[in-house]
Regions:
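N-terminal Rossmann-like NAD(P) cofactor-binding subdomain of oxidoreductases
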Residues: 7-195
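Short, Lys/Arg-enriched N-terminal segments with co-localized hydrophobic residues
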Residues: 1-7
């Protein structure tokens, strides 16, 4: 008798973001995952394939307009692909429901509220979860990520710098007081809307 595999129920919050499309593509290839919820701030009835035509006939699932007081509580994990400040409104709702969260915004990348507020020039409204977040760089924090309820996905600039520098620093080849990083980004580096 074959045993049925239990699928991990996944939600994507901010489903119309470009990063969400990439998450969907990865998850669709995973045999143990079921995409159960696609939440968006957009109004109206539409499917994810209406926003991303490449998903037509692959994932024609409807998107749900997110209401903070009426979010699904039956998920195993949620990917939050919302802009900074907005993400921190949703993350604690899922954590309080016992749902693991991978936050793709910058809202949980710093463990100190004062550091976040200095660099992002805005108040952090969920400081109690800052020190619970694990920096989501598996090359360095793989074991912590496995156990984390909240993973703060690192940004592109820090990732490019850390991946190259970490082995050099840990082996004593580079001193941290004289590092200069010069990085550039294309127009799509800041999301769907031009900035």
């Amino acid at each position: 008798e074959k045993r049925r595999r239990l699928l991990v129920k996944v939600g994507i919050i901010g489903a119309t973001a470009y990063t969400s499309l990439e998450i969907v593509k990865i998850l669709l290839r995973h045999p143990d995952v079921e995409i159960s919820y696609l939440g968006t701030r957009r109004e109206g009835d539409f499917k994810i394939s209406d926003i991303f035509p490449a998903l037509e006939n692959t994932l024609d699932m409807p998107c749900s307009q997110m209401v903070l007081d009426d979010l699904p509580k039956d998920l195993d994990i949620v990917f939050v692909a919302l802009p900074p400040v907005i993400a921190m409104q949703y993350v604690p709702v899922f954590l309080n429901a016992g749902i693991r969260v991978v936050d793709l915004s910058a809202d949980y990348r710093f463990q100190e509220k004062s550091t976040y507020e200095k660099w992002y020039d805005t108040k952090h409204t969920d400081p109690s979860n800052l020190d619970k977040a694990v920096y989501g760089l598996p090359e360095i924090f793989r074991e912590k990520i496995k156990k984390a309820n909240l993973v703060a996905n690192p940004g592109c600039y820090p990732t490019s710098a850390i991946i190259g520098l970490a082995p050099l620093i840990s082996n004593g080849y580079v001193h941290t007081d004289d590092i200069i990083i010069d990085a550039k980004s294309g127009i799509s580096g800041r999301g769907r809307e031009p900035k």
